[in-house]
Each structure stands twice: as structure tokens, then as C-alpha cells.
């Protein structure tokens, strides 16, 4: 059986199958943006519903400005609802604390909504610095649970971590919960 692959948009990674859950560590905001722009461009150009979970390091206004300058037709993608920006507090901490089961269910609901609207699948990126401010064990357990189920879905997930915000054991935790870094 042939596995359907998607363009990652990231040259060193190439094509990836649905169900890919990977991460990157970045040193600067520029490194983060240099990955996110081609990643989202590939998703938008290939009829994927895209979500960017923003943090204090990656603000919504900054993200919109960069994508508007870098992705041809970005205002059209935004207007038709193919791209969403969601603050991490609204996505991961919606009930005031992190609830892994609720977040996993929310991803599945977003995917189902995207498929019903005719999109090929769901592509998202999140900057996981928010996890440091909360329960790191709960966040790493969520990462492992997500990694165990993502293969069943038309989802591609890129988790971004500020290298300056992770110690050695946390880096090992992160790498262990992703297919590759």
C-alpha cells in the first residue's frame, strides 16, 4: 500500500506522510520564522487547513505580517478561513489548566471540521514554551499520547521549542515524543 505524502515545505525534510509529528529547536525568532513560513506555505498551497498556536514569543500580529509578506495570496487564505491563529491560552489552557484529553479531542474536532469543509487535512504548528510555565510532566505525557494517535489522522504537527528554554533532560523528553527533531 502506497502511503500518501505531503510537502513539508522544509527543504531538509522533504515530503512527509500524514500523521507526522516532529519538532524543531530554535535559537532565534528568525530561525523559527524561517521554518514556519515554508511549512505553512506548503500546507496552504496544498489545500490543508492550517493552525498556528501563538505564544508570547510568537505573537499573532507578527505571524500575520510575516506570512502576508512571504506567502503569495495569504490574505485570500485568511479570508476564506483556511488559516487560523489561536493563542496558546485559548487552545491548551482553555479551562484554566492543561487537560490532555480535551486538547486531543479538540485536534480531532478541528480535523473533522477541516475535512467537512473540503480540506485535505490539518497542519499545525505550536510553540511549546507555554509548557514550561505549567506542568512539564503533563505536557510530555500529552506529547507521548499525541504521538501514539496522530498516525491515525490526516494531521501534520510541528512543535517548536526555544533551545534557551530547555535543559538537557527536557530536550531528551521532547525528542522522545516526536518522530524526529
Describe every region a protein language model picked out.
Residues 1-181:
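Non-catalytic regulatory/interaction regions at protein termini and inter-domain linkers
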Amino acid at each position: 500500500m502506497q502511503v500518501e505524502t505531503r510537502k513539508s515545505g522544509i527543504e531538509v525534510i522533504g515530503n512527509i506522510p500524514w500523521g507526522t509529528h516532529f519538532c524543531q529547536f530554535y535559537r532565534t525568532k528568525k530561525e523559527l520564522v524561517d521554518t514556519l513560513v515554508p511549512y505553512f506555505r506548503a500546507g496552504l498551497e496544498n489545500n490543508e487547513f492550517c493552525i498556528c498556536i501563538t505564544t508570547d514569543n510568537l505573537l499573532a500580529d507578527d505571524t500575520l505580517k510575516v506570512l502576508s509578506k512571504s506567502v503569495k495570496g495569504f490574505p485570500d487564505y485568511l479570508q476564506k478561513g483556511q488559516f487560523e491563529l489561536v493563542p496558546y491560552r485559548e487552545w491548551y489552557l482553555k479551562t484554566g489548566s492543561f487537560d490532555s484529553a480535551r486538547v486531543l479531542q479538540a485536534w480531532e474536532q478541528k480535523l473533522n471540521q477541516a475535512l467537512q469543509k473540503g480540506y485535505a487535512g490539518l497542519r499545525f504548528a505550536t510553540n511549546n514554551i507555554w509548557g514550561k510555565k505549567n506542568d512539564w510532566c503533563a505536557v510530555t505525557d500529552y506529547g507521548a499520547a499525541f504521538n501514539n494517535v496522530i498516525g491515525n489522522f490526516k494531521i501534520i504537527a510541528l512543535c517548536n521549542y526555544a533551545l534557551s528554554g530547555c535543559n538537557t533532560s527536557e530536550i531528551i523528553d521532547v525528542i522522545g515524543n516526536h518522530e524526529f527533531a
